[in-house]
């Protein structure tokens, strides 16, 4: 049987590194279909830190796409697992027959599914991408994204799968020891990416709570974002006193980020699509409820796991937030499907499906 090839077709260092390390540590030892990767980006020590994997790096999207298409044409039994699919050339290859549906398996990351960019080239490309998506052999996604995708592509097979968020299961019960009282701290956004709509989110928080809460805005990723960070800071200072606004411009190491999250009482995310599942997982693990946009279908995954969900359209106050905290504290977090190690079973099944080992 031909070994499955995994494709990280865009240079998204943080996510790509997470996927590679997860496969190296959790999957490669038990499945030959978890070892071969084609990746856009620089090695930067990844080969050394992932010795169980065979990783081929490419300088850009186009060179990787050309190599994938050549492999697909040379052997029609060769199957590919696309982790997030932001590479236009690969969509066009699927649409034109360069890659066959039986060769194309796609794990939806969120941003690669929704049509939120307003630029002309995106608006011209979206209809072509939609046509190509009808030809995907199987999609893997969160419950909410599967539901969203099925509205336009009901005939494409869909399977539940969660991004492998880096988590320590031993921390699942730590939140229960924490006393929550006094001024609330609210986390706004999951990164410095503009998709978080930071300014609109800060205004929404201020409208709900006024200048009575402390707001923390993590913006250390992506790099070279100083102008936008300053724009958000100035907008925040128009709404909140200096002591109540903390805009973080430096990238935090994982343990420091975890410590930051555990100081919060609420996460506030207004983006209208599924994103930031890693931050959501870490907040939920710490017993911190989240406010979501009702257009973000991840609320379906949360309610399926009996987790409280607050919405940006709700009338929020401290009593409601504290009640959500109490509800979250009563949930057995060891049973949550999108937590580590529970998502591992979904990955093992996804590999078997993509490799053709199970129907």
Swiss-Prot record:
It catalyses: beta-D-ManNAcA-(1->4)-alpha-D-GlcNAc-di-trans,octa-cis-undecaprenyl diphosphate + dTDP-4-acetamido-4,6-dideoxy-alpha-D-galactose = alpha-D-FucNAc4-(1->4)-beta-D-ManNAcA-(1->4)-D-GlcNAc-undecaprenyl diphosphate + dTDP + H(+). It is a peripheral membrane protein. Keywords: Cell inner membrane, Cell membrane, Glycosyltransferase, Membrane, Transferase. The keyword Membrane applies. It is found in: Cell inner membrane. GO terms for molecular function: 4-acetamido-4,6-dideoxy-D-galactose transferase activity; fucosyltransferase activity. Pathway: Bacterial outer membrane biogenesis; enterobacterial common antigen biosynthesis. The keyword Membrane applies. It comes from the Bacteria. Its EC number is 2.4.1.325. InterPro entries: WecF (IPR009993). GO terms for biological process: enterobacterial common antigen biosynthetic process; fucosylation. NCBIfam families: PRK02797.1-1, PRK02797.1-2, PRK02797.1-3. Catalyzes the synthesis of Und-PP-GlcNAc-ManNAcA-Fuc4NAc (Lipid III), the third lipid-linked intermediate involved in ECA synthesis. This is TDP-N-acetylfucosamine:lipid II N-acetylfucosaminyltransferase.
């Amino acid at each position: 049987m031909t070994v499955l090839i995994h494709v990280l077709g865009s240079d998204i260092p943080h996510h790509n590194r997470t996927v590679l390390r997860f496969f190296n540590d959790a999957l490669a030892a038990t499945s030959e279909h978890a070892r071969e990767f084609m990746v856009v980006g620089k090695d930067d020590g990844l080969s050394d830190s992932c010795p169980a994997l065979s990783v081929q790096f490419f300088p850009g999207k186009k060179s990787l796409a050309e190599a994938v298409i050549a492999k697909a044409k040379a052997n029609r039994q060769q199957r590919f697992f696309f982790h997030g699919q932001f590479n236009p050339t690969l969509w066009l290859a699927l649409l034109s027959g360069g890659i066959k549906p039986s060769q194309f398996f796609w794990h939806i990351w969120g941003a690669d599914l929704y049509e939120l960019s307003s630029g002309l080239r995106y608006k011209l490309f979206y209809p072509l991408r939609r046509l190509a998506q009808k030809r995907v052999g199987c999609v893997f996604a969160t419950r909410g994204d599967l539901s969203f995708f099925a509205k336009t592509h009901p005939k494409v097979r869909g399977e539940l799968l969660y991004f492998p968020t880096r988590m320590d299961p031993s921390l699942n019960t730590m939140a229960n020891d924490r006393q929550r009282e006094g001024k609330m701290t609210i986390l706004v956004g999951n990164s410095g990416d503009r998709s978080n709509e930071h300014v609109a989110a800060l205004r929404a928080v201020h409208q709900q709570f006024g200048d009575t809460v402390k707001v923390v805005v993590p913006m250390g990723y992506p790099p070279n974002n100083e102008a936008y960070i300053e724009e958000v800071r100035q907008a925040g200072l128009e709404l909140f006193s200096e002591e109540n606004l903390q805009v973080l411009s430096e990238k935090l190491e994982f343990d420091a980020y975890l410590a930051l999250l555990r100081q919060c009482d609420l996460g506030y995310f207004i983006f209208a699509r599924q994103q930031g599942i890693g931050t959501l997982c870490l907040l939920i693990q710490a017993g911190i409820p989240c406010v979501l946009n009702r257009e973000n279908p991840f609320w379906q995954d949360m309610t399926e796991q009996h987790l409280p969900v607050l919405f940006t359209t709700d009338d929020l106050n401290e009593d409601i937030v504290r009640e959500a905290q109490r509800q979250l504290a009563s949930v057995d977090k060891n049973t949550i499907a999108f937590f580590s190690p529970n998502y591992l079973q979904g990955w093992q099944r996804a590999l078997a499906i993509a490799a053709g080992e199970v129907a």
